Design a protein with these regions (language model features):
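Charged helix-capping and loop-helix junction motifs
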Residues: 78, 105-109, 163-168, 194-197
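Active-site beta->alpha N-cap acidic-glycine motif
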Residues: 10-100, 104, 108-118, 209, ...
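Catalytic grooves of carbohydrate-active enzymes
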Residues: 172-214
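CE4/NodB-like, metal-dependent polysaccharide N-deacetylase domain
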Residues: 51-60, 64, 85-86, 95, ...
Length: 226
């Protein structure tokens, strides 16, 4: 039992594997493209700052938004869209999506879907699980609601103490088809916030155009059979 529990724990946090359906952590492409994803929010401080930074570098990103945060922050969601960015579903309450009932998963997905559509989002088909956690119930719910499970293959996992170190780690890991995860929405994300311009500069210096997840998927070389 202990071995089984450990195996399930590892699967639940695996970035590029899902017991049900497909977990997209990287896109097989012959184009030198990377996708930038920004998780959480929207927040009154972090979102305008992130949008300003993206505009400065003429870059679009995919914002995975929390439903409870988006409700009441419709203008921020609309500004994300107006700037040409993409919006994805990041659950309603930002809890770990493991060990719940089918109804719970459906509610988390569809309450967020409703909040985002109320703010003007029309094309909703990308879902990122909070903390990257998933087993069987969540992927099944995503399939029921025609969502794709989007993970990532690049993040700062080194606990960088400076924006320069953070950016260097992210830029070093990037390769064609990478999906980059950053958290820049909250006060506790100061290092990542300061690193964002450095990441954009570093990726550009390496010759990587930065796109949304949806754009990256359009350059996918092959789609695995379902």
């Amino acid at each position: 039992m202990l071995a089984l529990a450990f195996a399930l724990f590892r699967v639940s946090r695996a970035r590029c594997f899902s017991l049900v359906g497909e977990a997209i952590c990287h896109v097989d492409t012959d184009q030198p493209l990377v996708a930038l994803t920004l998780d959480d929010g929207p927040t009154a401080d972090g979102t305008p700052w992130a949008l300003s930074t993206l505009r400065r570098y003429r870059v679009h990103a995919t914002f995975f938004l929390i439903g409870a945060s988006a409700a009441g922050q419709e203008k921020l969601v609309q500004q994300i869209l107006a700037d040409g960015n993409e919006v994805g579903n990041h659950s309603f309450t930002h809890v770990r999506m493991v060990g719940h009932s089918a109804g719970f998963y459906d509610s988390e997905i569809m309450r967020t879907d409703a909040a985002l559509r109320q703010a003007g989002v029309q094309d909703l088909h990308l879902f990122r699980p909070p903390y990257g956690k998933k087993l069987i119930g969540l992927p099944r719910a995503l399939a029921r609601h025609d969502y794709r499970l989007i993970m990532w293959d690049v993040e700062d996992s080194s606990g960088a103490a400076t924006p320069q170190a953070y950016a260097a780690e992210v830029v070093r890991q990037a390769r064609p088809g990478s999906i980059i995860l950053m958290h820049v929405m909250y006060r506790g994300d100061r290092i990542a916030q300061a690193a964002l311009p450095l990441v954009l500069q570093g990726l550009k210096a390496r010759g990587f155009p930065i796109v949304t997840v949806g754009e990256l998927l359009r350059y996918r070389r092959s789609v695995p059979p379902h």
